[in-house]
Amino acid sequence: HEIGGWGNTHMFQVSTVCTWDGDVGNIYIDKNVDSLEKSNVNIKPLSQLKFDLDDFREDGGYLLGHNIAAFDLPVLKNAMDIYCIKKYLDEKAYIDTSAIVSKAYGERYSLSNLCQHTLGLDKIMDSADAPVVWKSGGYMEVAEYCLKDCQLVFDLWKHGQNNSIVKGYSIDNKEMKELEVKW
């Protein structure tokens, strides 16, 4: 709300970006969160992100996210001026679990909804709370939240790949649904 709404991604101030490949996580951040660094979690400066994303795409990598095409990629492209994001968008080198489910079923299912009902797991913070927590100095909490979201998306995607089904509560129909997925 402070930046004038979702249509103004160029005005966003990106504080943290995380990636997770199923084994190793990267937290791109310019604040001290070194205590989050583990054998499978790397802490890197935000300035390194564009190089890692470019290398990943050059190696044929695809990005995975929930609502990645409508939110994450435009924010990275417009607010951080990461030019290689255009490659991902133009080449459709991403898997957007939200867009796939929404297109197939005509209803949007949040990451929280799908993860609760499919995996029995939930997000550790609502996305709307992250800027408030960040401004109050909760850099570690926001970094953990971002990394956990990446892990949840990966686990949901993997479950869908292995079982061809994810589960969610349909707000439109007020019932639990098994959603067949092909991703």
Pin down the residues of each PLM region.
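Entry/capping segment at the start of metal-dependent catalytic domains
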Residues: 1-14, 18, 91
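A structural signal for well-ordered alpha-helical scaffolds and beta->alpha junctions
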Residues: 10, 107-111, 150
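Hydrophobic side chains within alpha-helical segments
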Residues: 16, 75, 99, 152-153
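Conserved DEDDh/DEDDy metal-dependent 3′-5′ exonuclease domain
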Residues: 23-108
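Acidic, Mg2+-coordinating catalytic module of metal-dependent nucleases/exonucleases
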Residues: 113-114, 118-177
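Short, amphipathic C-terminal "tail helix"
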Residues: 178-183
